Every structure is written in structure tokens, then in C-alpha cells.
Amino acid sequence: SLLLAYTKKQFLDAYTTTVFDNWAVSVHIDQRNYAVSLFDTAGQNSYEQIRCLSYPHANVFLVCFSLVDKKTLESCRTTWLPEIRKYAGDNVPVMLVGTKNDLLENSESQNVVSEEYAKKVAAEIGCLKYFSCSALTHKGLKLVFDESFLAGVGVKFEEEPPNPCCTIL
């Protein structure tokens, strides 16, 4: 999991997905400290009704796909972005994140997603930015989260919480 790699600085080959995982981290941005909640939700269709409950108060979304599996990028376009916009609206920033960039060097598969194509899809589906990273090597990982925190800090809700915080889903 990308969130496990970021929060615990570890990579598990046999990570078992759950319906809903969350982590809390403290982040220092622009001379302010923020309590950040990070959520990972199950991707199976049968969990949409549960998953959507966490969308309305997210400050930013990371929509992830595998750089070595084009089908996962198409799922971002056909499933994840429409679902996010349906339940969270059009104003919440979305970052498109290509994962497993450590596998690109040794992959000769037709399923590999080029950076150019990923950026094109990100623009087409209305993502604020595109990043690639690796949970295994941590290459690009900090940048993904730093930029996401910065994007999420600017999101305003009708009722602001008393303490500065950011929720990334």
C-alpha cells in the first residue's frame, strides 16, 4: 500500500486490503502544522455504498493506477473519477498517481503506461496533477504526498473545523 509505505516507511509484499484503512500524520507546511488523516478504501464494486460515505469531507483525492497495467488507468477514467465527482463534487482536487514505477525499467509489456499518456489522461479527466512513484523504493513518494497536502490545504468547506487539518482519500 502506498499509504503504508508513506506513513510507516515499509513495504509489504503480501499487503492484505481491507474495506477501510486510515492513518494519521503530522505535516508542517508553510510554517503551520497540520493533522492529516489518510484513508484507503476498498476498490471492489460491492463497497461503493460504504466507500462513498468518506468522500464528502475529503480535501484531496489520490487516484492510483499501476504503471504496468493500462487497464487500471482506464478504471480511473471510467470508474474512479466519475464516482468521486458524484459524491464529492467538482471542486475537490484529484491527483492521478502512477504506482510501481520501479517496475518500468524491466518491463517490456504492451500494458505499460507511458508518462506522456498518463499526463494526457490526467488532463482529460480533470486531475490537478499527475505523479509517478514507487511504494517499494519510495521514489517520488514524498512528492506525491507533499503536493497533495498543499492542494488539500486550500479546500474550503461550509463549516471549517477548529483545528487545521487535511483529509486525503
Located regions from the model:
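Polybasic, Ser/Thr-rich amphipathic helices
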Residues: 162-169
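TRAFAC-class small GTPase G-domain
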Residues: 1-158
